[in-house]
Design a protein with these regions (language model features):
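C-terminal helical subdomain
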Residues: 179, 199-235
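Conserved glycine-rich Rossmann-like NAD(P)H-binding loop of the short-chain dehydrogenase/reductase
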Residues: 29-46
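Substrate-binding pocket helix/loop in short-chain dehydrogenase/reductase
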Residues: 96-107
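Active-site helix of classical SDR
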Residues: 120, 155
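Conserved glycine-rich cofactor-binding loop
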Residues: 15-17
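Residue(s) in the substrate-gating loop at a strand-loop-helix junction
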Residues: 140
Length: 261
């Protein structure tokens, strides 16, 4: 661990969106960063910004988390110890499961699930030895509600279930874990996935700062499942209380459940 100096947070996917929001918020709280994504130019620009605005130092790891080598490089860095890990990199796709490119589906599973598993496994031993550390795994409300897309929702359900199970196992170790479950957030996500969001009502949109602020406050409060926004807290609660076949129908009708993987 790095307690003698500034604490260090490793964030996957900070080249845009929620990950960039975590990087700015944590740099503002005094962390140095390890920035992990494919777009080196974006990571270098962020590192410069974090240095100028907050005096934070950043290591840049420009790797593809869909590859074995990419994940191995991050695992090796985590084994040397970090104070916080934010498993945020992830993506969705459009089209139906049965016509989607199998290679793309596999890389989605590798980024959204395998990387979360391997990076968490790599970070924990040093944290447990130190008796402290934080891991935020970015899931989605899509992982809480049935009937909204297939592989993306399944990947996020894995992240929720994995993180909640892990929280039980880590009780008493001093290490905190959180499954962050945002609804729609204004980032590059939907454009990259090719998802048309033009008919999504304003009330369903969250902004990155709100999501990051809620996550960090919930971490301090010891909440394992963090759901930013009152509208999504209500939806998630309703999703547990209403019969699941009705939830499936509603999410397919109002959530445009077809054409998603
Ligand atoms: N936006 C939403 O409505 C929403 C809602 C719920 C949950 N989420 C989740 O929030 C997380 C962040 O998404 P976002 O909304 O901030 O989207 P975004 O702006 O598209 O950012 C995604 C990040 O993931 C990184 N990434 C994607 N594939 C990668 C790969 N193969 N290797 C390494 N990094 C990779 C991207 O970096 P590079 O392209 O540089 O590699 C980028 O930094 C995701 O896990 C997403 O599922 C988003």
């Amino acid at each position: 661990m790095t307690s003698a100096q500034r604490p260090v947070a490793l964030i996957t996917g900070p080249s845009s969106g929620i990950g960039a929001g975590f990087a700015r918020a944590l740099a503002g709280k005094g962390y140095d960063l390890v920035l992990v994504a494919r777009n080196r130019a974006a990571l270098d620009a962020l590192a410069t910004e974090l240095q100028q605005r907050f005096g934070a130092s950043s290591e840049v790891l420009a790797v593809d988390l869909a590859t074995v080598e990419g994940r191995r490089a991050v695992v090796e860095r985590l084994a040397r110890g970090v104070d916080m890990l934010v498993n945020n990199a992830g993506f969705g796709t459009t089209g139906e499961f049965w016509t989607a490119d199998p290679a793309l589906l596999q890389s989605q599973l590798d980024v959204n699930v395998t990387a979360v598993l391997e990076l968490t496994r790599a970070a924990l031993p040093v944290m447990i030895d130190a008796g402290r550390g934080d891991i935020v795994n970015v899931a989605s409300v899509a992982g809480l509600l049935p009937g909204r897309g297939s592989t993306y929702s399944a990947s996020k359900a894995y992240v929720v279930s994995f993180t909640e199970g892990l929280a039980g196992g880590l009780a008493g170790t001093g290490v905190r874990v959180q499954a962050l479950c945002p609804g729609f957030v204004r980032t590059e996500f939907h454009r990259r996935a090719g998802i048309d969001m033009s008919s999504t009502p304003d009330i369903l949109w969250l902004d990155v700062d709100q999501v990051v602020r809620t996550s960090l406050a919930d971490l301090e409060a010891g909440k394992v499942r963090s759901i930013p926004g009152v509208q999504y807290k209500v939806l998630a609660t309703a999703g547990r209380l209403v019969p699941q076949n009705l939830v499936r129908k509603l999410t397919n009708t109002f959530g445009n459940g077809r054409g998603r993987t």
